[in-house]
């Protein structure tokens, strides 16, 4: 995010309302440009291919297929990405770049394996129980795997800071998708929904191929050191847990409402609650720019203070360590407050825009009644995510797991309770869950501030840990001379 960070800091550095709005637009577009491209392609296909003329069940089958492809592609990728990012950061620091492709192939294998374990049983159920045509089912599965591939390769392009290429590849892929869908319907006279699904699948595979080609162009050598990657999963399992619980928490409130009487079941396989799911999508888009704003500002500001503190720990005086520590935590507090201030302006502007114009575009009723509460929830959620990033900086993996677990469980319990409330309070479960997670993370950061010296200087071990019999505590015998263990060491 360094390139984006420089641009954003030039914008926000003027500290005016106008520049905040400009920064809002820039960060939002850079963050969700790929998603906007996909949504735009779907809207174009639905409008020009007369999607509304298709039967209701067929339309809902297509909509639910696309919804499930996106949600579960994110969920199945979440356990691996954080550990792989950690491994690649260490590899880049050590300048052993040949290990990156080994990491890429291991991560890709794990992603595809988990996605297949989730997707294949569902597809079998969809075919046998839902009586959906097997070609349609297989095409949907291919689209799911392709999107998993796309999301996974985006991780490596982000490390290479090729954010513009990611957006460019999505534009190419979705342009091909739209053109192919027209050809399938007008030229080959295929059904509208299957043509759209097939074209979307081909578009995803094209994006995945383009991303893979760029990754291969950057990292041509493969060390074959696959075992080291698996070792990281064993050592940094808290990262796996944190990322999975955080991603699950993003959608667990949807899953709770999918069990209520509001749910709609399509072909005895897909479950959804359209008004709530749409409100969730709008609320997430309203606040998603917070992530890129925060990460870019951390790289440009807090990271420098963190680096100065680390250098003081390595070779500075006691007073230098104390001064740099205070400056670092002062910057941490400033960044959290700045994020809250800027994101509040962004959220408020987008929220007012949605409340005024979306009803004119057909969004209304229950969706717009649920939307405000969910917007507040996602506002707190991205502030909580910022705190998790800070916990990563201080290697507080236990705190990050506690934060993600409390967030996920509180959101689930709160959502179960909120199903008995009126529509306007349906999103209160997410608000409560995010606030609980934010509070846990804040408490861990304050505890880290008070006990940072203990965390830094008292977590090492004077003796190397090994497995085996415990050596004799006797290091010297005045009557026998050196002990047997000392003689072996010498």
Predicted regions: what they are:
Residues 1-42, 60-64, 230-239, 456-490:
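N-terminal membrane topogenesis motif
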Residues 157-183, 391-413:
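Alpha-helical transmembrane segments of multi-pass membrane transporters/permeases
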Residues 67-72, 109-113, 121-156, 345-350, ...:
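Alpha-helical transmembrane segments of multi-pass membrane proteins
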Residues 60-89, 247, 251, 280-305:
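Small-residue-rich midsections of specific transmembrane alpha-helices
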